[in-house]
C-alpha cells in the first residue's frame, strides 16, 4: 500500500427510500451519499468505480464502470467531492463495499478503498 492509497478517505451515509420500495415484491431501495476526501498533497482524479453489493440472502452483484454519476471528478488536496446514488436490494438488509480507481496529479494510478457499509430498513437492527 502506497501513501496515495491512504490519501483518500471515503465517508458514507445511507437512507432507506420507503416510498419507492415495495417489500411485498422484495424490492428495497436505498440511497447512499458518498463523500470522497483528498487528504493527500496532490490532486486526484476518480476514473473508475467497482462495487460489490451483497444482500441478506448472500446474493452478490458487482458494478464496474467509469466515474460516478456520469462524472470523473478531480479532487484537489484538502477538498472533498460528494455525490448521491442508489441501489435496489431483494432483502431489507445488505452490504456494499468496493474501490475507486484513482490517478494522481503525477500520473500514478492507485485504489481508494470503500470500506463495507450496511444498507438496512429502519428498525431492522437494534
Swiss-Prot record:
One of its GO terms (biological process) is error-free translesion synthesis. Gene3D superfamilies: ApaG domain. Residues 2-126 form the ApaG domain. PANTHER family: F-BOX ONLY PROTEIN 3, POLYMERASE DELTA-INTERACTING PROTEIN 2. NCBIfam families: PRK05461.1 (NF003967). HAMAP family: ApaG. This is Protein ApaG. It comes from Shewanella baltica (strain OS155 / ATCC BAA-1091). The gene is apaG.
Amino acid at each position: 500500500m502506497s501513501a496515495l492509497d491512504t490519501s483518500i478517505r471515503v465517508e458514507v451515509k445511507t437512507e432507506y427510500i420507503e416510498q419507492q420500495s415495495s417489500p411485498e415484491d422484495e424490492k428495497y431501495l436505498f440511497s447512499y451519499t458518498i463523500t470522497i476526501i483528498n487528504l493527500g498533497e496532490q490532486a486526484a482524479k476518480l476514473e473508475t468505480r467497482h462495487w460489490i453489493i451483497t444482500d441478506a440472502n448472500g446474493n452478490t452483484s458487482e458494478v464496474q464502470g467509469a466515474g460516478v454519476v456520469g462524472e470523473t471528478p478531480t479532487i484537489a488536496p484538502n477538498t472533498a467531492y460528494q455525490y448521491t446514488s442508489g441501489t435496489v436490494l431483494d432483502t431489507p438488509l445488505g452490504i456494499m463495499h468496493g474501490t475507486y480507481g484513482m490517478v494522481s496529479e503525477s500520473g500514478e494510478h492507485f485504489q481508494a478503498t470503500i470500506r463495507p457499509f450496511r444498507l438496512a430498513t429502519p428498525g431492522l437492527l437494534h
